[in-house]
């Protein structure tokens, strides 16, 4: 099965072509300050040309549904739903926090991916490996990073994600020596991971929606002033 996956939920844009039989075929990842609407279709076209495939070769489409950038999520979901609809192929929507956590196989401590939500806030959840399988231990959440970590000070935890990179000093202040940080490349979301997770998942094209988890900053400001 050939899977085309896309991730546009953060500043990083990524597209990957993945075979369920042989693994990753090709991947394009861009961490540049351009809107995903400008480059995601270009990345998909280039990826297909470089790997000598066409869109009709794809058996399944997969996409990050968030949380993260509201605009980025909307773009990615719209693009992949459009491709799945036009080709009549299956679709899968994968949570961004699951994607980031899945990118490491750290087994001797818990894993907390943090996606930046600005102003020392983040999207987060907590994971650990049980019998070789990654298991989510918390609900997906959003809020003050300090408040979320307050009752976790005594645990050894591996942090990753753009929020962990941005607020590394804050996390160190809270956690002390119990905080470990993944190398920077593991904190970048990768579409190839989305593709791998999506192998055993299938969603309804017409009901698949973005997973925002919180209201956009503009909406929060409007409510605050009301």
Each PLM stretch: what is its role?
Residues 37, 41, 80, 97, ...:
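A general structural signal for well-ordered alpha-helical segments in protein cores
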Residues 47-51, 86, 104, 194-201:
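Stable alpha-helical structural segments in soluble proteins, enriched in small hydrophobic residues
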Residues 32-35, 90-187, 212, 217:
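Surface "functional belts" at beta-alpha junctions
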């Amino acid at each position: 099965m050939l899977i085309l996956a896309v991730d546009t939920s953060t500043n990083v844009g990524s597209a990957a072509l993945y075979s369920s039989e042989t693994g990753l075929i090709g991947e394009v990842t861009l961490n540049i300050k351009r809107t995903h609407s400008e480059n995601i279709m270009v990345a998909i076209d280039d990826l297909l040309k470089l790997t000598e495939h066409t869109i009709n070769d794809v058996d399944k489409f997969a996409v990050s549904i968030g949380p993260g950038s509201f605009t980025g999520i909307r773009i990615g979901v719209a693009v992949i739903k459009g491709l799945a609809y036009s080709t009549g192929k299956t679709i899968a929507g994968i949570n961004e926090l699951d994607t980031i956590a899945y990118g490491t196989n750290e087994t001797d401590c818990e894993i907390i991916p943090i996606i930046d939500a600005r102003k020392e806030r983040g999207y987060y959840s907590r994971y650990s490996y049980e019998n070789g399988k990654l298991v989510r231990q918390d609900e997906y959440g959003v809020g003050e990073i300090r408040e979320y970590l307050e009752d976790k000070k005594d645990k050894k935890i591996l942090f990753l994600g753009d929020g962990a990179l941005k607020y590394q000093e804050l996390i160190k202040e809270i956690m002390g020596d119990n905080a470990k940080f993944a190398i920077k490349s593991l904190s970048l979301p990768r579409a190839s991971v989305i593709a791998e997770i999506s192998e055993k998942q299938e969603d309804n094209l017409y009901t698949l929606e973005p997973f925002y988890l919180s209201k956009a900053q503009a909406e929060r400001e409007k409510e605050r002033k009301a």
